[in-house]
Amino acid sequence: LDIGVGKDAKGSMKIREFLRKHPEYAGGTIGVVALDARGVLCAATSTGGVTLKLPGRVGDTPLPGAGTYANKFAASSATGTGEYVIRSLSCRAISEGVERGKSLDDSVTEMLAQMTRDFDADVGFIAIDANGHAVANHSTAHMPHAFFKDDSKIVARMFVEKA
């Protein structure tokens, strides 16, 4: 496969076409964000795997601020094209937006819009703020996610309108 990076690269299109024809090769990122009873925010992300990745490639998942980030204002996890998530340090930017006074919804929505504008990237985010407000938003075709608070009913969603 011809794999390229950048707004004009055709590599990601070829990968998407390949995965549409061969969904058995698709992997998925798993992200978790939480606010515990003491008010501590945390985030964790598991990579979608190494299928169709270049040898030696380091994705966004292990890089704090890129695919995973938490501070006292917000915690978030990203999924999508890792190179774009790395370039934007998207999860850190979401927390910094909340720290500057933006709502979590606005911070996530603005980061998603920026990544779509700058990279035409297929990405998604889950995030939670220090008040326990959770957000999931994406530009991918789908991003299954679920959330609950205390003893509340678990809410699970498979499809959400694209931003």
Map each language-model feature to its residues:
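N-terminal nucleophile
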Residues: L1-A163
